[in-house]
Amino acid sequence: MEDILRMLEEDGRLTPAQIAERTGRSEQEVAQEIKRLEEQGVIRKYQAVIDWEKAGAEKVYAFIEVKVAPQRGVGFDAVAQRILRFPEVHSLHLISGDHDLHVVLQGTNMKEVAYFVAEKLAPLEGVQSTGTHFVLKTYKMHGHIFPQEEQPGRLPVTL
């Protein structure tokens, strides 16, 4: 099972036949195992990693640290449930450290992200403070290394 999961995590487009060839199992056995993993929710989604800059789309990613006042009986979950419903929220994690929640937000520009933080996130009951960090460049995402464009060389420094 774990070998199938690793292969699909690396390339979600692999067919049961390709996986069967690599694992020495039958295609039918692999297909049944994948179906079982999907039904159990182990495999949640097949997703492409897209370089939006190369696609010519304007996308801005921001990491937002959120300090939350936990509520009795539910902790951080009540606030997290409200935050995850926003379509702009790409991912949401409970974290250790100085902040409680880590929000990855996708927007079309910095102004849109700022609006989300000021008008949607910060006013939520239980949110005490936020800190926003904009992604300036992506080197690796979901295990995929983004090739870097050749930058013009620096001029030599002479004294």
Please place each PLM-identified region on the residue numbering.
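A compositional/biophysical signature of low hydrophobicity enriched in polar/charged and small residues
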Residues: 1-159
